[in-house]
Design a protein with these regions (language model features):
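Generic marker of residues within folded, mature protein domains
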Residues: 16-18, 39, 191
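A generic secondary-structure signal marking the coil-to-beta-strand transition
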Residues: 1, 22-24, 45, 130, ...
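Conserved AdoMet/S-adenosylmethionine-binding subsite of the radical SAM
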Residues: 83-88, 96-212
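Conserved Radical SAM active-site core
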Residues: 3-6, 10, 33-129
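S-adenosyl-L-methionine
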Residues: 1-3, 7-23, 28-30
């Protein structure tokens, strides 16, 4: 298959359990919960997305083989100065599981990478992933109900935290919804975490730091 990628870049993971860890981000184009066009936002399942995942950007491309995609990801990693660390690629979107398959996961592994995915959880995952982070969106039904991390953007009227507490994840995070009322949402998330200690707070540190 041809992999359509919006952008590939090297940065620090800004969210969740791996916050602060260097990683190459591979942002796949397309999503099943929103077209990415502002004209369609109000009618989308996910109305609060803050990411441009439409088409191919200058740091992305179309890759016709898994090895070509893995080579593009590998070219961003600072191999000469990374002795003793395990390279990490974070497959994100959009919705990466519309494109990410077992062949790509295998190619990433062959290139020396640990493979993480950030997904809305509505699509099945290929075998071999090292880290699955599910971020539920509104009332969209989940296909993925187990993994390493569940990260819930909060608050969502159709996605209360208690709906997900029986699922099989190692970490449960609330992340304040960004936007005009982010201060209010942060306060609500803090209050919920304090009242329900199973949940931890995730903040978008990359935005605070001004990095990608």
């Amino acid at each position: 298959m041809t992999y359509t990628v919006k952008e590939i870049f090297y940065t620090l993971q800004g969210e969740g359990a791996n916050a602060g860890r260097p990683a190459v981000f591979c942002r796949f184009s397309g999503c099943n919960l929103w077209t990415g066009r502002e004209a369609d936002r109000a009618s989308a399942v996910c109305t609060f997305c803050d990411t441009d995942f439409v088409g191919v950007g200058p740091d992305g491309g179309k890759f016709t083989t898994p090895s070509d995609l893995a080579a593009a990801v590998s070219s961003r990693w600072p191999w000469r100065s990374s002795e003793g660390s395990r390279p990490l690629v974070v497959c994100t979107g959009g919705e990466p599981l519309l494109q990410l398959d077992s062949a790509a996961v295998e190619a990433f592994h062959d290139a020396g990478f640990e493979v993480a995915v950030e997904t809305n959880g509505t699509q099945p995952a290929p075998a071999g992933l090292d880290w699955i982070c599910v971020s539920p969106k509104s009332s969209a039904p989940l296909v993925l109900t187990s993994g390493e991390e569940l990260k819930l953007v909060y608050p969502q009227a159709d996605a209360p935290p208690e709906r997900f507490e029986s699922l099989d994840f190692d970490h449960f995070f609330l992340q304040p919804m960004d936007g005009p009322v982010v201060a209010r949402n942060t306060r609500l998330a803090v209050e919920y975490c304090l009242a329900h200690p199973r949940w931890r707070l995730s903040v978008q540190t990359h935005k605070a730091l001004g990095i990608r």
